[in-house]
Protein backbone atom coordinates (compact mmCIF):
# COMPACT_ATOMS: atom_id res chain seq x y z
CA UNK A 1 0.00 0.00 0.00
CA UNK A 2 1.30 3.47 -0.84
CA UNK A 3 1.54 5.45 2.38
CA UNK A 4 0.24 9.01 2.80
CA UNK A 5 2.63 11.16 4.77
CA UNK A 6 1.42 13.97 7.00
CA UNK A 7 2.32 16.73 4.55
CA UNK A 8 0.44 15.09 1.69
CA UNK A 9 -2.51 14.40 3.95
CA UNK A 10 -2.74 18.02 5.09
CA UNK A 11 -2.45 19.25 1.51
CA UNK A 12 -5.16 16.85 0.39
CA UNK A 13 -7.49 17.79 3.21
CA UNK A 14 -7.20 21.45 2.23
CA UNK A 15 -8.29 20.93 -1.37
CA UNK A 16 -11.49 22.60 -2.45
CA UNK A 17 -14.82 20.85 -2.77
CA UNK A 18 -17.42 21.38 -5.44
CA UNK A 19 -21.00 21.76 -4.36
CA UNK A 20 -23.23 19.10 -5.86
CA UNK A 21 -26.49 19.62 -7.64
CA UNK A 22 -29.61 17.82 -6.57
CA UNK A 23 -32.04 15.72 -8.46
CA UNK A 24 -34.89 13.37 -7.68
CA UNK A 25 -35.12 9.82 -8.90
CA UNK A 26 -38.84 9.27 -8.42
CA UNK A 27 -39.74 10.89 -11.72
CA UNK A 28 -37.23 8.78 -13.61
CA UNK A 29 -38.57 5.56 -12.12
CA UNK A 30 -42.16 6.59 -12.75
CA UNK A 31 -41.58 7.49 -16.39
CA UNK A 32 -39.69 4.30 -17.20
CA UNK A 33 -37.16 6.11 -19.37
CA UNK A 34 -33.84 7.75 -18.78
CA UNK A 35 -33.66 11.53 -18.28
CA UNK A 36 -32.34 13.51 -21.21
CA UNK A 37 -29.22 14.73 -19.41
CA UNK A 38 -28.11 11.20 -18.67
CA UNK A 39 -28.31 9.71 -22.15
CA UNK A 40 -24.57 10.11 -22.72
CA UNK A 41 -23.41 10.20 -19.11
CA UNK A 42 -20.86 7.80 -17.70
CA UNK A 43 -20.38 7.48 -13.95
CA UNK A 44 -17.10 5.97 -12.80
CA UNK A 45 -17.50 4.03 -9.53
CA UNK A 46 -14.35 2.84 -7.76
CA UNK A 47 -14.71 0.14 -5.08
CA UNK A 48 -12.67 -2.49 -3.33
CA UNK A 49 -12.40 -5.99 -4.75
CA UNK A 50 -14.98 -7.66 -2.56
CA UNK A 51 -14.02 -10.59 -0.36
CA UNK A 52 -17.32 -12.07 -1.51
CA UNK A 53 -16.64 -12.38 -5.27
CA UNK A 54 -20.28 -13.17 -6.00
CA UNK A 55 -21.18 -9.63 -4.97
CA UNK A 56 -18.85 -8.09 -7.54
CA UNK A 57 -20.46 -10.35 -10.12
CA UNK A 58 -23.90 -9.04 -9.16
CA UNK A 59 -22.67 -5.50 -9.72
CA UNK A 60 -21.15 -6.32 -13.10
CA UNK A 61 -23.77 -8.67 -14.48
CA UNK A 62 -26.97 -7.14 -13.07
CA UNK A 63 -26.47 -3.65 -11.66
CA UNK A 64 -24.50 -2.22 -14.59
CA UNK A 65 -27.08 -3.12 -17.27
CA UNK A 66 -29.99 -2.18 -15.00
CA UNK A 67 -28.38 1.20 -14.33
CA UNK A 68 -28.19 2.07 -18.01
CA UNK A 69 -31.75 0.90 -18.57
CA UNK A 70 -33.19 2.79 -15.60
CA UNK A 71 -31.12 5.98 -15.74
CA UNK A 72 -29.46 6.10 -19.12
CA UNK A 73 -26.15 6.17 -17.27
CA UNK A 74 -23.26 3.99 -18.36
CA UNK A 75 -21.70 2.68 -15.17
CA UNK A 76 -17.95 2.20 -15.27
CA UNK A 77 -17.28 -0.10 -12.31
CA UNK A 78 -13.66 -0.44 -11.24
CA UNK A 79 -12.52 -2.69 -8.40
CA UNK A 80 -9.07 -2.62 -6.79
CA UNK A 81 -7.36 -3.90 -3.66
CA UNK A 82 -8.67 -1.91 -0.70
CA UNK A 83 -5.10 -1.19 0.40
CA UNK A 84 -4.67 0.86 -2.80
CA UNK A 85 -7.77 3.04 -2.48
CA UNK A 86 -6.24 5.84 -0.42
CA UNK A 87 -3.32 6.32 -2.79
CA UNK A 88 -5.80 6.44 -5.66
CA UNK A 89 -7.85 9.13 -3.93
CA UNK A 90 -4.73 11.20 -3.28
CA UNK A 91 -3.65 11.15 -6.92
CA UNK A 92 -7.18 11.80 -8.18
CA UNK A 93 -7.75 14.83 -5.95
CA UNK A 94 -4.34 16.30 -6.69
CA UNK A 95 -4.86 15.91 -10.44
CA UNK A 96 -8.52 16.95 -10.36
CA UNK A 97 -9.46 13.89 -12.35
CA UNK A 98 -10.57 10.41 -11.41
CA UNK A 99 -13.58 8.32 -10.43
CA UNK A 100 -16.82 10.20 -9.80
CA UNK A 101 -17.77 8.01 -6.84
CA UNK A 102 -15.29 6.22 -4.60
CA UNK A 103 -16.24 3.72 -1.94
CA UNK A 104 -14.04 4.06 1.15
CA UNK A 105 -13.74 2.24 4.45
CA UNK A 106 -13.81 3.05 8.14
CA UNK A 107 -13.57 6.76 8.95
CA UNK A 108 -11.55 7.59 5.84
CA UNK A 109 -14.21 10.12 4.70
CA UNK A 110 -12.88 12.47 7.38
CA UNK A 111 -9.53 12.65 5.59
CA UNK A 112 -11.11 13.96 2.40
CA UNK A 113 -13.88 16.13 3.78
CA UNK A 114 -12.72 19.26 1.95
CA UNK A 115 -12.44 17.39 -1.36
CA UNK A 116 -15.85 15.74 -1.57
CA UNK A 117 -19.34 16.95 -2.37
CA UNK A 118 -22.20 17.45 0.05
CA UNK A 119 -24.59 14.52 -0.39
CA UNK A 120 -27.02 15.41 2.38
CA UNK A 121 -30.05 15.27 0.12
CA UNK A 122 -29.24 11.75 -1.06
CA UNK A 123 -28.25 10.36 2.33
CA UNK A 124 -31.27 11.79 4.13
CA UNK A 125 -33.60 10.38 1.48
CA UNK A 126 -32.12 6.89 1.76
CA UNK A 127 -32.01 6.91 5.54
CA UNK A 128 -35.59 8.09 5.88
CA UNK A 129 -36.83 5.40 3.50
CA UNK A 130 -34.96 2.55 5.21
CA UNK A 131 -35.52 2.91 8.94
CA UNK A 132 -32.70 5.32 9.72
CA UNK A 133 -28.94 4.84 9.84
CA UNK A 134 -27.03 3.05 12.55
CA UNK A 135 -25.27 5.43 14.92
CA UNK A 136 -21.92 4.27 13.55
CA UNK A 137 -22.83 5.32 10.01
CA UNK A 138 -24.16 8.68 11.14
CA UNK A 139 -21.17 9.37 13.38
CA UNK A 140 -18.68 8.83 10.57
CA UNK A 141 -20.49 10.32 7.59
CA UNK A 142 -22.46 13.20 9.10
CA UNK A 143 -20.37 16.20 10.16
CA UNK A 144 -22.17 19.10 11.82
CA UNK A 145 -25.41 18.13 10.13
CA UNK A 146 -23.89 17.67 6.66
CA UNK A 147 -23.52 14.28 5.03
CA UNK A 148 -20.07 13.98 3.47
CA UNK A 149 -20.77 10.50 2.14
CA UNK A 150 -23.62 8.08 1.59
CA UNK A 151 -23.29 5.08 3.95
CA UNK A 152 -23.31 1.84 1.97
CA UNK A 153 -22.85 -1.01 4.45
CA UNK A 154 -21.26 -2.02 7.74
CA UNK A 155 -18.99 -5.03 7.98
CA UNK A 156 -16.43 -6.15 10.49
CA UNK A 157 -14.65 -9.09 11.99
CA UNK A 158 -15.38 -11.92 14.38
CA UNK A 159 -13.15 -14.79 15.37
CA UNK A 160 -13.34 -17.60 12.81
CA UNK A 161 -12.58 -20.87 14.61
CA UNK A 162 -12.07 -24.59 13.97
CA UNK A 163 -14.73 -26.42 15.97
CA UNK A 164 -13.05 -29.83 16.14
CA UNK A 165 -9.71 -28.44 17.33
CA UNK A 166 -11.33 -26.40 20.10
CA UNK A 167 -13.33 -29.51 21.04
CA UNK A 168 -10.05 -31.38 21.53
CA UNK A 169 -8.91 -28.92 24.21
CA UNK A 170 -12.20 -28.92 26.11
CA UNK A 171 -14.29 -26.26 24.41
CA UNK A 172 -17.27 -28.17 23.06
CA UNK A 173 -21.02 -27.71 22.93
CA UNK A 174 -20.86 -24.01 22.17
CA UNK A 175 -18.27 -23.13 24.80
CA UNK A 176 -15.42 -20.76 23.97
CA UNK A 177 -12.76 -18.85 25.95
CA UNK A 178 -14.43 -15.75 27.37
CA UNK A 179 -11.38 -13.75 28.50
CA UNK A 180 -8.00 -12.97 26.98
CA UNK A 181 -6.32 -15.11 29.62
CA UNK A 182 -8.52 -18.09 28.71
CA UNK A 183 -8.03 -17.47 24.99
CA UNK A 184 -4.25 -17.34 25.46
CA UNK A 185 -4.26 -20.60 27.43
CA UNK A 186 -6.30 -22.26 24.68
CA UNK A 187 -4.02 -20.83 22.01
CA UNK A 188 -0.92 -22.21 23.69
CA UNK A 189 -2.41 -25.70 23.70
CA UNK A 190 -3.41 -25.40 20.07
CA UNK A 191 -0.05 -24.00 18.95
CA UNK A 192 1.74 -26.79 20.82
CA UNK A 193 -0.48 -29.20 18.85
CA UNK A 194 0.52 -27.55 15.57
CA UNK A 195 -2.59 -25.39 15.19
CA UNK A 196 -1.58 -21.79 16.05
CA UNK A 197 -3.81 -18.75 15.98
CA UNK A 198 -3.33 -16.41 13.02
CA UNK A 199 -3.36 -12.63 13.30
CA UNK A 200 -1.77 -9.88 11.23
CA UNK A 201 0.47 -7.13 12.59
CA UNK A 202 1.03 -5.73 9.11
CA UNK A 203 -0.06 -2.54 7.38
CA UNK A 204 -3.34 -3.80 6.01
CA UNK A 205 -6.69 -2.02 6.09
CA UNK A 206 -9.06 -4.46 7.78
CA UNK A 207 -7.76 -7.31 9.90
CA UNK A 208 -4.95 -5.36 11.59
CA UNK A 209 -6.95 -2.46 13.09
CA UNK A 210 -9.96 -4.77 13.37
CA UNK A 211 -8.12 -6.84 15.97
CA UNK A 212 -5.72 -4.46 17.72
CA UNK A 213 -8.08 -1.54 18.36
CA UNK A 214 -10.71 -3.69 20.15
CA UNK A 215 -7.87 -5.46 21.95
CA UNK A 216 -6.57 -2.10 23.24
CA UNK A 217 -10.05 -1.00 24.34
CA UNK A 218 -10.70 -4.29 26.13
CA UNK A 219 -7.80 -3.51 28.46
CA UNK A 220 -9.15 -0.03 29.15
CA UNK A 221 -6.71 1.71 26.82
CA UNK A 222 -7.72 4.67 24.66
CA UNK A 223 -6.12 7.02 22.17
CA UNK A 224 -7.47 10.32 23.51
CA UNK A 225 -9.77 11.71 26.16
CA UNK A 226 -13.39 12.57 25.40
CA UNK A 227 -12.34 16.09 24.34
CA UNK A 228 -10.77 14.54 21.24
CA UNK A 229 -7.55 16.47 21.84
CA UNK A 230 -5.76 15.19 24.93
CA UNK A 231 -3.69 12.13 24.02
CA UNK A 232 -4.23 9.44 26.67
CA UNK A 233 -2.46 6.42 25.18
CA UNK A 234 0.47 6.39 27.60
CA UNK A 235 -1.40 4.67 30.43
CA UNK A 236 -0.98 1.65 32.67
CA UNK A 237 -3.85 -0.03 30.81
CA UNK A 238 -2.12 0.37 27.45
CA UNK A 239 1.23 -0.83 28.81
CA UNK A 240 -0.44 -3.88 30.37
CA UNK A 241 -2.09 -4.67 27.03
CA UNK A 242 1.24 -4.51 25.23
CA UNK A 243 2.98 -6.74 27.78
CA UNK A 244 0.23 -9.33 27.48
CA UNK A 245 0.31 -9.11 23.67
CA UNK A 246 4.01 -10.05 23.62
CA UNK A 247 3.32 -13.28 25.50
CA UNK A 248 0.13 -13.95 23.55
CA UNK A 249 1.99 -13.58 20.27
CA UNK A 250 4.77 -15.96 21.30
CA UNK A 251 2.53 -18.53 22.96
CA UNK A 252 -0.34 -18.64 20.48
CA UNK A 253 0.28 -17.06 17.10
CA UNK A 254 1.85 -17.90 13.78
CA UNK A 255 4.68 -15.37 13.97
CA UNK A 256 4.69 -14.94 10.20
CA UNK A 257 1.65 -12.74 10.78
CA UNK A 258 3.92 -9.71 11.04
CA UNK A 259 3.87 -9.54 7.24
CA UNK A 260 0.31 -10.66 6.53
CA UNK A 261 -2.24 -8.69 4.55
CA UNK A 262 -6.01 -9.16 4.70
CA UNK A 263 -5.95 -12.25 2.51
CA UNK A 264 -3.11 -14.08 4.27
CA UNK A 265 -5.13 -15.40 7.19
CA UNK A 266 -7.82 -16.55 4.75
CA UNK A 267 -5.30 -18.69 2.93
CA UNK A 268 -3.78 -19.96 6.18
CA UNK A 269 -7.13 -20.99 7.63
CA UNK A 270 -8.39 -22.59 4.43
CA UNK A 271 -5.16 -24.60 4.15
CA UNK A 272 -5.54 -25.94 7.69
CA UNK A 273 -2.59 -24.00 9.09
CA UNK A 274 -4.33 -21.94 11.80
CA UNK A 275 -7.14 -22.61 14.24
CA UNK A 276 -8.54 -19.14 15.00
CA UNK A 277 -8.34 -15.71 13.37
CA UNK A 278 -10.18 -12.41 13.45
CA UNK A 279 -11.83 -11.99 10.07
CA UNK A 280 -14.98 -11.21 8.19
CA UNK A 281 -17.08 -14.15 7.07
CA UNK A 282 -15.12 -14.61 3.85
CA UNK A 283 -13.27 -17.73 5.06
CA UNK A 284 -16.49 -19.51 5.91
CA UNK A 285 -18.26 -18.41 2.73
CA UNK A 286 -15.36 -19.53 0.54
CA UNK A 287 -15.19 -22.92 2.26
CA UNK A 288 -18.95 -23.34 1.92
CA UNK A 289 -18.86 -22.38 -1.75
CA UNK A 290 -16.21 -25.02 -2.50
CA UNK A 291 -16.94 -27.93 -0.13
CA UNK A 292 -14.90 -30.40 -2.16
CA UNK A 293 -11.84 -28.15 -2.29
CA UNK A 294 -11.52 -27.22 1.37
CA UNK A 295 -11.44 -30.24 3.64
CA UNK A 296 -10.45 -31.03 7.21
CA UNK A 297 -7.62 -33.46 7.96
CA UNK A 298 -10.35 -36.12 8.23
CA UNK A 299 -11.58 -35.41 4.71
CA UNK A 300 -14.84 -33.76 5.76
CA UNK A 301 -16.03 -30.37 4.42
CA UNK A 302 -14.18 -27.60 6.24
CA UNK A 303 -17.16 -25.25 6.33
CA UNK A 304 -18.98 -27.62 8.68
CA UNK A 305 -16.09 -27.30 11.15
CA UNK A 306 -16.23 -23.47 11.42
CA UNK A 307 -17.97 -21.24 13.93
CA UNK A 308 -17.79 -17.51 14.70
CA UNK A 309 -17.43 -15.73 18.04
CA UNK A 310 -16.71 -12.25 19.34
CA UNK A 311 -13.25 -11.28 20.52
CA UNK A 312 -12.65 -12.09 24.22
CA UNK A 313 -13.39 -9.79 27.12
CA UNK A 314 -10.80 -7.80 29.00
CA UNK A 315 -10.83 -5.75 32.17
CA UNK A 316 -12.16 -2.83 30.15
CA UNK A 317 -14.93 -4.70 28.35
CA UNK A 318 -15.60 -6.51 25.08
CA UNK A 319 -15.55 -4.67 21.77
CA UNK A 320 -15.47 -4.86 17.99
CA UNK A 321 -14.39 -2.40 15.31
CA UNK A 322 -17.07 -2.34 12.61
CA UNK A 323 -15.95 -1.55 9.08
CA UNK A 324 -18.05 1.26 7.65
CA UNK A 325 -18.32 1.40 3.86
CA UNK A 326 -19.17 4.81 2.39
CA UNK A 327 -19.69 6.13 -1.13
CA UNK A 328 -18.01 9.50 -1.64
CA UNK A 329 -19.03 11.85 -4.46
CA UNK A 330 -15.77 13.49 -5.40
CA UNK A 331 -15.70 17.26 -5.61
CA UNK A 332 -13.75 17.31 -8.88
CA UNK A 333 -16.39 15.23 -10.67
CA UNK A 334 -17.98 16.91 -13.67
CA UNK A 335 -20.93 14.50 -13.42
CA UNK A 336 -22.38 15.71 -10.13
CA UNK A 337 -26.05 15.43 -11.05
CA UNK A 338 -25.73 12.09 -12.80
CA UNK A 339 -23.61 10.74 -9.96
CA UNK A 340 -26.19 11.80 -7.38
CA UNK A 341 -28.99 10.15 -9.30
CA UNK A 342 -26.86 7.02 -9.54
CA UNK A 343 -26.28 7.06 -5.78
CA UNK A 344 -30.00 7.47 -5.08
CA UNK A 345 -30.76 4.58 -7.37
CA UNK A 346 -28.06 2.10 -6.30
CA UNK A 347 -28.74 2.71 -2.58
CA UNK A 348 -32.49 2.30 -3.04
CA UNK A 349 -33.98 -0.81 -1.48
CA UNK A 350 -34.80 -2.90 -4.60
CA UNK A 351 -31.38 -2.31 -6.14
CA UNK A 352 -29.28 -2.56 -2.99
CA UNK A 353 -31.09 -5.75 -1.97
CA UNK A 354 -29.62 -7.61 -4.94
CA UNK A 355 -26.11 -6.86 -3.71
CA UNK A 356 -26.98 -7.30 -0.02
CA UNK A 357 -28.45 -10.77 -0.57
CA UNK A 358 -25.33 -11.87 -2.45
CA UNK A 359 -23.26 -10.97 0.63
CA UNK A 360 -25.01 -13.77 2.60
CA UNK A 361 -24.45 -11.85 5.83
CA UNK A 362 -20.86 -10.73 5.22
CA UNK A 363 -22.05 -7.15 5.81
CA UNK A 364 -25.04 -5.43 7.36
CA UNK A 365 -26.80 -2.62 5.61
CA UNK A 366 -25.95 0.87 6.86
CA UNK A 367 -29.63 1.40 7.66
CA UNK A 368 -31.63 -0.56 10.21
CA UNK A 369 -33.99 -1.89 7.54
CA UNK A 370 -31.58 -4.70 6.75
CA UNK A 371 -31.26 -6.26 10.21
CA UNK A 372 -34.77 -7.69 9.62
CA UNK A 373 -33.91 -9.20 6.23
CA UNK A 374 -34.58 -12.95 5.69
CA UNK A 375 -30.91 -13.47 4.79
CA UNK A 376 -30.20 -13.69 8.53
CA UNK A 377 -32.50 -16.72 8.84
CA UNK A 378 -30.63 -18.81 6.28
CA UNK A 379 -27.48 -19.86 8.14
CA UNK A 380 -27.05 -19.64 11.93
CA UNK A 381 -23.25 -19.61 11.55
CA UNK A 382 -23.59 -16.18 9.91
CA UNK A 383 -26.03 -14.70 12.41
CA UNK A 384 -23.43 -13.16 14.79
CA UNK A 385 -22.41 -10.71 12.06
CA UNK A 386 -25.87 -9.12 12.16
CA UNK A 387 -25.18 -7.54 15.54
CA UNK A 388 -21.80 -5.93 14.81
CA UNK A 389 -23.18 -2.40 14.21
CA UNK A 390 -24.66 -2.43 17.71
CA UNK A 391 -21.61 -3.63 19.65
CA UNK A 392 -18.91 -1.64 17.90
CA UNK A 393 -16.68 1.22 18.93
CA UNK A 394 -14.92 3.56 16.50
CA UNK A 395 -11.28 4.58 16.13
CA UNK A 396 -10.36 7.74 17.99
CA UNK A 397 -12.06 6.63 21.21
CA UNK A 398 -12.74 8.23 23.65
CA UNK A 399 -12.93 11.15 21.22
CA UNK A 400 -14.74 11.29 17.88
CA UNK A 401 -13.69 9.36 14.74
CA UNK A 402 -12.50 12.62 13.19
CA UNK A 403 -9.76 13.50 10.73
CA UNK A 404 -7.00 13.06 13.31
CA UNK A 405 -8.29 9.60 14.23
CA UNK A 406 -8.41 8.71 10.54
CA UNK A 407 -4.81 9.82 10.13
CA UNK A 408 -3.75 7.65 13.08
CA UNK A 409 -5.41 4.53 11.72
CA UNK A 410 -4.09 5.24 8.21
CA UNK A 411 -0.56 5.43 9.60
CA UNK A 412 -1.07 2.18 11.58
CA UNK A 413 0.31 3.74 14.77
CA UNK A 414 -1.69 1.51 17.13
CA UNK A 415 -0.86 -1.61 15.13
CA UNK A 416 2.82 -0.68 15.00
CA UNK A 417 2.89 -0.16 18.77
CA UNK A 418 2.14 -3.85 19.23
CA UNK A 419 4.34 -4.92 16.31
CA UNK A 420 7.36 -3.14 17.77
CA UNK A 421 6.82 -4.81 21.13
CA UNK A 422 6.51 -8.36 19.81
CA UNK A 423 9.74 -7.78 17.89
CA UNK A 424 11.62 -6.91 21.07
CA UNK A 425 11.02 -3.28 21.99
CA UNK A 426 10.16 -2.93 25.71
CA UNK A 427 6.45 -2.37 26.26
CA UNK A 428 6.99 1.02 27.90
CA UNK A 429 9.11 2.20 24.97
CA UNK A 430 6.60 0.98 22.39
CA UNK A 431 3.79 2.84 24.14
CA UNK A 432 5.95 5.96 24.50
CA UNK A 433 6.72 5.87 20.77
CA UNK A 434 3.04 5.52 19.86
CA UNK A 435 2.06 8.25 22.31
CA UNK A 436 4.52 10.67 20.72
CA UNK A 437 3.25 9.80 17.24
CA UNK A 438 -0.32 10.53 18.35
CA UNK A 439 0.74 13.85 19.84
CA UNK A 440 2.16 14.84 16.44
CA UNK A 441 -1.20 14.11 14.84
CA UNK A 442 -3.46 15.65 17.48
CA UNK A 443 -1.38 18.79 18.09
Report the location of each language-model feature.
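N-terminal secretory signal peptides and thylakoid transit peptides that target proteins
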Residues: 1-19
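Extracytoplasmic/periplasmic substrate-recognition and gating elements
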Residues: 39-41, 70, 145, 165-172, ...
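Conserved C-terminal helix/tail region of periplasmic/extracytoplasmic solute-binding proteins
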Residues: 74, 91, 167, 194, ...
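Hinge/lid segment of periplasmic solute-binding proteins
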Residues: 105-158, 184, 211, 301-310
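Short, solvent-exposed loop/beta-turn-alpha elements that line the ligand-binding surface or hinge
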Residues: 120-133, 176, 203, 219-240, ...
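Extracytoplasmic/periplasmic solute-binding protein
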Residues: 143-152, 157, 181-231, 237, ...
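Glycine-centered hinge/linker elements that transmit conformational signals in sensory
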Residues: 184-190, 227-259, 307, 311
Amino acid sequence: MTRIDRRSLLKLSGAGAIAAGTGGIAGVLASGRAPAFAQASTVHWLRWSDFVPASDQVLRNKIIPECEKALGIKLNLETINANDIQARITSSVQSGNGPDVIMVLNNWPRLYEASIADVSDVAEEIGKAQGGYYDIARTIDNVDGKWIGVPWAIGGGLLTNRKSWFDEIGYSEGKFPETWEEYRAAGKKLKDAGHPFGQTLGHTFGDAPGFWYPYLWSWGGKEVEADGKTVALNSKETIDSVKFAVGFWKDCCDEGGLAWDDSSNNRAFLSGTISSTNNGASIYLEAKKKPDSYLTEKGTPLWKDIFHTRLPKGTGGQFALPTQFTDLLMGYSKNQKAAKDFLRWVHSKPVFEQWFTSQQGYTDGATKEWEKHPVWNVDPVMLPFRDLPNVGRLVGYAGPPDRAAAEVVTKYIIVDMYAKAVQGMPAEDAVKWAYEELVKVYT
